[in-house]
Regions:
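A generic tandem-repeat structural signature
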Residues: 68-123
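Alpha-helical segment of the N-proximal tetratricopeptide repeat
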Residues: 8-44, 48-55
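Structural marker of alpha-solenoid helical repeat scaffolds
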Residues: 4, 38, 72, 106, ...
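Helix-start (N-cap) detector for alpha-helical repeat units in TPR-like alpha-solenoids
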Residues: 8-9, 43-44, 77-78, 111-112, ...
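Terminal, low-structured helical/coil segments at or just beyond the last alpha-helical repeat
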Residues: 2-9, 156-194
Length: 194
């Protein structure tokens, strides 16, 4: 006697979770595939396949899984963000920027989407444009050094010494190691570091 679909789905989900726990990603992918046989639009299975194939470097498969997931859940900001991250990793900057912008349109407070958009803009040498998402990222994540570091680098590359100095001084208050790295890169000195 075959299990009803909800029980089978639960069973496959549990088996996939155990496989992940024991680092058997190949088997986990098989169980997620079985979940898709029951429901081709299962968001958990699609997201899990996308993440696992991306981690294995199987980018096209991951991208296809994210696309399928977004066909089912078009307003999933996380999926758009992750798709953007994957596209940036594949050097498809315009697609990455579009995905990050879509994530931000859905969730304006998605700090990582702002950061991802900024990194894509920096990679495309669109430094002036990168300032807006960097400033939003540092507002949303004021204690994360990554946005501040990139903001200082962009300000420095744009020749804005005063703004770079302000960011460097701010960063030195809570992340002196990163501030010292910026000192080496910019030639500026943080007023709060000895």
């Amino acid at each position: 006697m075959q299990m009803p679909n909800p029980i089978r789905r639960w069973f496959f989900d549990q088996m996939a979770a155990w496989c992940m726990l024991f680092r058997r990603r190949d088997l986990a992918l098989e169980y997620y595939g079985k979940m898709l046989e029951l429901d081709p639009g299962d968001p958990l299975a699609l997201a899990s396949i996308a993440f696992q194939t991306a981690q294995q470097g199987r980018r096209q498969e991951a991208l296809a899984a994210f696309d399928r997931l977004l066909a089912v859940q078009p307003d999933d900001a996380e999926a758009h963000f992750n798709r953007g991250f994957l596209l940036e990793d594949m050097n498809e900057r315009e697609g990455a920027m579009a995905a990050f912008r879509r994530a931000i349109a859905i969730n304006p407070d998605h700090d990582r989407a702002h950061y991802g958009l900024a990194l894509s803009l920096i990679s495309a040498r669109r430094l002036e444009e990168a300032l807006v998402p960097l400033k939003k990222n540092t507002k949303l994540q004021p204690m994360s050094p990554y946005g501040w570091y990139q903001l200082a680098r962009v300000q420095h590359e744009l020749g804005r010494t005063d703004e770079t100095q302000q960011v460097l001084d701010h960063l030195a208050r809570f992340e002196p190691k990163i501030a010292r790295q910026l000192e080496r890169e910019t030639g500026l000195r943080a007023s709060t570091l000895s």
